[in-house]
Amino acid sequence: MTSVTDHSAHSMERAAEHTINIHTTAGKLAELHKRTEEALHPVGAAAFEKVHAKGKFTARERIYALLDDDSFVELDALARHRSTNFGLGENRPVGDGVVTGYGTIDGRDVCIFSQDVTVFGGSLGEVYGEKIVKVQELAIKTGRPLIGINDGAGARIQEGVVSLGLYSRIFRNNILASGVIPQISLIMGAAAGGHVYSPALTDFVVMVDQTSQMFITGPDVIKTVTGEDVTMEELGGAHTHMAKSGTAHYVASGEQDAFDWVRDVLSYLPSNNFTDAPRYSKPVPHGSIEDNLTAKDLELDTLIPDSPNQPYDMHEVVTRLLDEEEFLEVQAGYATNIVVGLGRIDDRPVGIVANQPIQFAGCLDINASEKAARFVRVCDCFNIPIVMLVDVPGFLPGTEQEYDGIIRRGAKLLFAYGEATVPKITVITRKAYGGAYCVMGSKNMGCDVNLAWPTAQIAVMGASGAVGFVYRKELAQAAKNGANVDELRLQLQQEYEDTLVNPYIAAERGYVDAVIPPSHTRGYIATALHLLERKIAHLPPKKHGNIPL
């Protein structure tokens, strides 16, 4: 029930409005102030209180939390929808449900939009879509990263097909901007229908644990059509899209954590494809590689186990190679048999792609191949050198992998790496067998500098499998003669390992540029990055390659 006090307040507001004389300069300024204030609270303060009660920020608060203080410049703050159907003519909130503009992050210009779930549930209508299209085009034209903060419920049904038309324009702009400017999407609530395709077209997708959901069709529709019972979190929650679908690149513990991750990832990225990622003028070491060895470098000399079948954590290698041991891992919970992420070596941003021996022995499978391929393409788009750390016994065997398309989908990594023109450096730490050796940054796939540790095992296959092929007849004859076949097999395996399973055969043929002590790895990579800083590489003229999608 509305109180007498509420009626009095409303009457006073109406009286104040009537006292503004818009025919004077002072009145015009007062009118602007009134409209600007209305844009800040388009549906009233109570709606914001409901958002806060859920532990979430409002659309504007999210922008302020992400950007540098006092840097946000809003665009189209006074826009309103033009629809009159279904009573919308009487309900025209200022801003139409999305806040757009530009500002700075660490002093670098970015364009941004933030969807307002308090206005029509964050649903996209014509003017809402036009605002996003406008800021997308501004980002492309000025060569600035674009950040989208998503919290909306799909198309605005009351506005009909124009909503779908604007979705299509947004998607097309995402595609035109791809590889030109970094595009980052944050999912801060339940995003459904058309709201999920734009984030899927961007470079990085950040979700918030227990807060974010993404799906094309919701649980109710799925229940009706298929009979399946599934919750929103199970269907499209942050961990679902990290561990199962691979759509999410980072799962944040809260909204501020999500904003911090975006600021971090931007620090490794250039503003556009014609510029380089930021550098922070770190002093360059003088003297030889040996002169600059640290205790962390020396730890690498004892990291690889004596047994080739004993795993180790590749993160232990990665962090020791990077400045300040800082590694921004991407998709850490997806396809964990491969590790990808960003770091710096001598202040130069690099992309790391590394097999993970503690998961599937580091084997490549479908998901790992696609995860690595996408990351390689992101690095190539934005002029970030690629460093591969290789310990791979092969592709994961099994009928499931074969039926699901490991041939075609594994070839995506081959294609992505072969097409990349950025500096490419490979370090083989241990196993590099068969076709997986070729895929993981081999010299003949176009790698610029190939290094190997003395523990490297570069061969068509491991000793156990090879002996079964090469000495099949000898083993069969030994069995017939009653000899100790197991003892003979071990002897032949040792002979094979001593002869072929090492880095030196590849080094003799130039497939490895240098066999180095593990402790020298960071120094060798740093000098290679310096050498390749102005690398010139050209692909044959073409419209585009036909990657095996």
Swiss-Prot record:
Key words, A-Z: Transferase
Pathway as given in its UniProt record: Lipid metabolism; mycolic acid biosynthesis
Keyword Transferase attributed: yes
InterPro entries, alphabetized: AccD/PCCB, AcCoA_carboxyl_beta, ClpP/crotonase-like_dom_sf, COA_CT_C, COA_CT_N
Cellular component, GO, one term: acetyl-CoA carboxylase complex
Matching PROSITE patterns: COA_CT_CTER (PS50989), COA_CT_NTER (PS50980)
Molecular function terms, GO-annotated: propionyl-CoA carboxylase activity; transferase activity
E.C. code: 2.1.3.15, 2.1.3.-
Pfam families: Carboxyl_trans (PF01039)
Residues in CoA carboxyltransferase C-terminal domain copies: 295-542
Catalytic activities: N(6)-carboxybiotinyl-L-lysyl-[protein] + acetyl-CoA = N(6)-biotinyl-L-lysyl-[protein] + malonyl-CoA; N(6)-carboxybiotinyl-L-lysyl-[protein] + propanoyl-CoA = methylmalonyl-CoA + N(6)-biotinyl-L-lysyl-[protein]
CoA carboxyltransferase N-terminal domain boundaries: 25-281
Gene3D superfamilies to which the protein is assigned, alphabetical: 2-enoyl-CoA Hydratase, Chain A, domain 1
Keyword Transferase: yes
Family: Belongs to the AccD/PCCB family.
General function of this protein: Component of a biotin-dependent acyl-CoA carboxylase complex. This subunit transfers the CO2 from carboxybiotin to the CoA ester substrate. When associated with the alpha3 subunit AccA3, is involved in the carboxylation of acetyl-CoA and propionyl-CoA.
Self-association and partners: The biotin-dependent acyl-CoA carboxylase complex is composed of AccA3, which contains the biotin carboxylase (BC) and biotin carboxyl carrier protein (BCCP) domains, and AccD5, which contains the carboxyl transferase (CT) domain.
Protein name: Biotin-dependent acetyl-/propionyl-coenzyme A carboxylase beta5 subunit
Lineage: Bacteria, Bacillati, Actinomycetota, Actinomycetes, Mycobacteriales
